[in-house]
Amino acid sequence: MNAGIIGLGRYIPEKVLTNLDLEKMVETSDEWIRTRTGIEERRIASDDVNTSHMALAAAKKALADADVAAEDIDMILVATVTPDQAFPTVACMIQEQLGAHKACAMDISAACAGFMYGLVTGKQFIESGTFKHVLVVGVEKLSRITDWDDRNTAVLFGDGAGAAVLGEVSEGKGILSFELGADGRGGKHLYLDEKDHTIMNGREVFKFAVRQMGESSVNVIEKAGLSKEDVDFLIPHQANIRIMEAARERLELPVEKMSKTVHKYGNTSAASIPISLCEEIEAGKIHDGDVIVMVGFGGGLTWGAIAMRWGR
């Protein structure tokens, strides 16, 4: 049995915060932000929109796309570091709101790699025959944990949600291979402080990300018995255009074969990969049978990569 994505959905907040807006809030400039990160604007959820609201909206779209009823979902996994509260989890909240009453539900905290962790977890339950359908959501309200007076981090983050329904797919399709990893020794480089503000050692995180994104991408290709020439599209975590480009160059892919949404959404952590995948599918850039590599890294430090052949 092969597990793969059979439905996708996303939620993007309406409010746009541009680099020019940030120039009025903190000592920075549009040119400085664009040249160092590739970000031009990001979306910010309104005060009355919580993480669970965004997760629910993306989940409903994914279920509709998969043509799967909520009552047929066996497990809900929500990847987030910005839950509404410690408990109940976002997964349990949307379980109730969706009416997915037979599903078990839990949140996963692996920062920007969380969606990868969720997909791999769901894959195991489906391919073991334990569950038939697993809903995986990556969602963040990072504006809530951003220090808007810190020019180094205020320019980076945005809010949003992406969701995928996992189910059985045809032989040769779906998730072909994966790699998950963590290195707690690097936790001090990216963390939440006592004021609930994101603190980042940009230089160290950059070095880690460039190395690990490239290595993990190559590893999953080899595990799947493929070569770089077999890869049709790269969906990297949308953290920084320079990190993304390093991963693309490691795979020797042309620019048009890499997803880029960082310029309009910023870094949405666990939501960035599903949002990007959803947009590329809708734009017709990914076709049935295409080999996709998805790769992300995050606080922990954590990382994850997946090689997938698209289609049902």
From Swiss-Prot:
Residues 238-242 are annotated as: ACP-binding. GO terms for molecular function: 3-oxoacyl-[acyl-carrier-protein] synthase activity; beta-ketoacyl-acyl-carrier-protein synthase III activity. It catalyses: malonyl-[ACP] + acetyl-CoA + H(+) = 3-oxobutanoyl-[ACP] + CO2 + CoA. Pathway: Lipid metabolism; fatty acid biosynthesis. The keyword Lipid metabolism applies. InterPro entries: ACP_syn_III_C, ACP_syn_III_N, FabH, Thiolase-like. Its EC number is 2.3.1.180. GO terms for cellular component: cytoplasm. It holds the Pfam family ACP_syn_III_C. Catalyzes the condensation reaction of fatty acid synthesis by the addition to an acyl acceptor of two carbons from malonyl-ACP. Catalyzes the first condensation reaction which initiates fatty acid synthesis and may therefore play a role in governing the total rate of fatty acid production. Possesses both acetoacetyl-ACP synthase and acetyl transacylase activities. Its substrate specificity determines the biosynthesis of branched-chain and/or straight-chain of fatty acids. Belongs to the thiolase-like superfamily. FabH family. This is Beta-ketoacyl-[acyl-carrier-protein] synthase III. It comes from Bacillus pumilus (strain SAFR-032).
